């Protein structure tokens, strides 16, 4: 998985941002608890706690009070989480026809259109949501706003409009610079605009946070090839194989990259990880130490060295 502990059975990595069940607080149907899973973290708008409400309860709430926008938004979010896209859109449309600036309905509508492959229809609600939230004093810590920027960027990428996608994705990264999905999509935007150096920078940052990000390595291969850097392409192919648990293939490519690029810390690091999986711990330790000499401030390298040293000691 891209993010450790992340949910399974979701689309390819670049399409992953999962929205899950929200709730409706029932003290005679009072407050909506709008929440969503954002990668492997649970984010709650306004820091309200969600309740575990069944779909039957949510549907009953809407039938009993069809004019309540919060009830419809909660139901729409539940439908979105279940992949029932047409039902989700039906609910958000009902809300937006009366309350065109309901931010919950706008965000769910935009995400639902993106997830259902209707990227063009996603643009308007996402842009309106962003316009309503971007000038808030807390905008730079607004995770819902960050998510809207991400989906707007993904939608523009899908539509082949990289020049519009990249600013949205960069705005998402200002709020959360560790969002590997946004970094990957920004890399795709840069590729489309033939800025392969910048694309590689984005892909590199993505795999820093998610070492097994297969699609990011595929992006690296494409950009390194475009830049006529075959040895760096070997590194990316090796790490792609590593992410797919094909460690022998990874070893072959990474050893080739190491020989051609002895000062490239990432090749040594990739080899350390590969040797570790092949239980060649002494070789892994040598490789990670070389990587640390080349990149002494890399905390990830320090952690891997400690892990390998601990494993060697455990073997006696």
Segments and roles (model prediction):
Residues 2-74, 81-84, 90-91, 97:
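N-terminal leader/linker segments that initiate helical-solenoid repeat arrays
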Residues 61-64, 131-145:
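Flexible helix-coil transition and linker loops at the boundaries of alpha-helical arrays
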Residues 64, 98-99, 132, 175, ...:
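Structural marker of alpha-solenoid helical repeat scaffolds
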Residues 69-70, 103-104, 137, 145-146, ...:
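Helix-start (N-cap) detector for alpha-helical repeat units in TPR-like alpha-solenoids
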Residues 81, 115, 151, 158, ...:
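Register position in tetratricopeptide repeats
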């Amino acid at each position: 998985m891209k993010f450790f502990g992340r949910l399974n059975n979701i689309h390819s990595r670049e399409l992953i941002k999962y929205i899950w069940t929200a709730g409706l607080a029932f003290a005679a149907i009072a407050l909506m608890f709008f929440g969503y899973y954002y990668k492997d973290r649970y984010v709650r708008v306004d820091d309200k706690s969600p309740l575990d409400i069944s779909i039957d309860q949510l549907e009953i709430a809407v039938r009993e009070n069809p004019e309540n926008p919060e009830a419809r938004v909660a139901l729409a979010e539940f439908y979105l989480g279940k992949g029932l896209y047409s039902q989700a859109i039906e609910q958000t449309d009902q809300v937006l026809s009366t309350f065109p600036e309901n931010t919950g309905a706008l965000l769910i509508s935009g995400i639902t259109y993106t997830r259902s492959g209707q990227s063009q229809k996603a643009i308007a609600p996402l842009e309106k949501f962003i316009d309503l939230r971007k000038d808030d004093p807390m905008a730079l810590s607004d995770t819902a706003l960050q998510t809207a920027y991400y989906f707007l960027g993904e939608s523009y990428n899908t539509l082949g409009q990289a020049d519009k996608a990249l600013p949205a994705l960069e705005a998402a990264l200002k709020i959360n610079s560790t969002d590997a999905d946004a970094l990957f999509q920004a890399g795709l935007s840069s590729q489309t605009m033939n800025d392969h150096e910048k694309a590689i920078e984005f892909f590199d940052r993505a795999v820093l946070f998610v070492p097994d990000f297969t699609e990011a390595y595929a992006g690296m291969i494409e950009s390194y090839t475009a830049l006529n850097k075959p040895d760096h392409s070997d590194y990316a192919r090796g790490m792609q194989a590593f992410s797919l648990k094909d460690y022998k293939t990874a070893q072959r490519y990474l050893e080739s990259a190491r020989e051609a690029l002895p000062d490239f810390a990432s090749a040594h690091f990739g080899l350390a990880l590969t040797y570790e999986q092949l239980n060649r711990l002494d070789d892994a330790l040598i490789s990670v130490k070389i990587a640390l000499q080349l990149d002494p401030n890399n905390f990830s390298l320090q952690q891997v060295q400690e892990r390998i040293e601990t494993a060697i000691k455990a073997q006696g």
